[in-house]
């Protein structure tokens, strides 16, 4: 089976800066946690942010991520992260 992602949050985040593992986790078929690569972040106003999880306004952020398992199976995901004041 290819790797799978899971969001680590329930509900809204507060404005601030986060680590990837605060928000999204990935595992391989044997449930080993995998490194996640941040591809891009789009803020609620459509701005493409630098490669960091820095949420400075309320709204929905679109976070594109990628992971790869030991068998070189790659999986991409786009996760919508709601941020509230």
Positions of predicted regions on the chain:
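Extracellular interdomain linker/stem segments of modular secreted and single-pass surface proteins
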Residues: 1-3, 82-85
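Serine/threonine-rich, repeat-prone extracellular segments and beta-strand-based repeat modules
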Residues: 30-83
């Amino acid at each position: 089976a290819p790797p799978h992602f899971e969001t680590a949050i329930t509900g809204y985040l507060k404005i601030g800066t986060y680590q990837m593992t605060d928000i999204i986790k990935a595992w391989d078929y044997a449930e080993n946690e995998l490194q996640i690569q941040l591809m891009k972040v789009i803020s609620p106003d459509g701005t493409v942010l630098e490669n960091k999880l820095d949420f400075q306004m309320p709204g929905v952020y679109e976070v594109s991520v990628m992971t790869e398992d030991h068998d070189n199976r790659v999986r991409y995901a786009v996760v919508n992260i709601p941020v509230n004041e």
